[in-house]
């Protein structure tokens, strides 16, 4: 009987330990989209869009505003809810009455940034790094071999003229997106 009790207790302990080991914790960031949207609306910034990638920990602002101060205010509002998440501020400043001209200038500037970024990435031997440029914000994607190459890609992109922000979504085991303003 004693060996049966020991066996039963051992089996229960093993089952509990196994179940405890199976518990998972979510690495997703908190959903802040509705809170940011509500605060932007209250601030009169209704033309600003909000999206979030909870897996990567990135909150992205888009759309257009008439002044730099509005763009800065939108970023501050988003950051107040985002916590440790990166806020990618892709808002275009488009002056009222000159929307088409402003959009053309922004598109031309983004194209110039892409060209300069192509050259910079080749010089840094980072040809495999993928990126997108939207309203002077560079988003790096893909994979790199080391944390050093991840950092090199970020600093290389940040050094390109007219880049306002770099969102680094490059994957290196165990790391999340970062931002460099």
What are these regions (language model features)?
Residues 2-181:
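N-terminal targeting leaders
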């Amino acid at each position: 009987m004693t060996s049966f009790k020991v066996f039963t207790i051992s089996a229960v302990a093993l089952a509990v330990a196994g179940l405890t080991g199976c518990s998972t914790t979510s690495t997703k960031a908190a959903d802040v989209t509705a809170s940011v949207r509500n605060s932007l609306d209250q601030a009169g910034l209704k033309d600003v869009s909000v999206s979030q990638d909870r897996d990567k920990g990135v909150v992205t602002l888009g759309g257009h505003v008439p002044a730099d101060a509005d763009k800065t205010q939108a970023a501050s509002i988003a950051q107040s809810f985002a916590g440790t998440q990166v806020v990618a501020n892709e808002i275009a400043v488009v002056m009222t009455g000159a929307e088409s001209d402003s959009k053309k200038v922004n598109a031309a500037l983004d194209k110039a940034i892409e060209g300069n970024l192509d050259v910079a990435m080749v010089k840094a031997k980072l040809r495999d790094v993928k990126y997108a440029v939207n309203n002077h914000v560079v988003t790096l994607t893909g994979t790199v071999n080391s944390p050093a190459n991840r950092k090199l890609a970020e600093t290389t992109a940040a050094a390109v003229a007219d880049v306002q922000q770099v969102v680094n979504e490059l994957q290196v085991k165990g790391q999340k997106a970062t931002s460099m303003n």
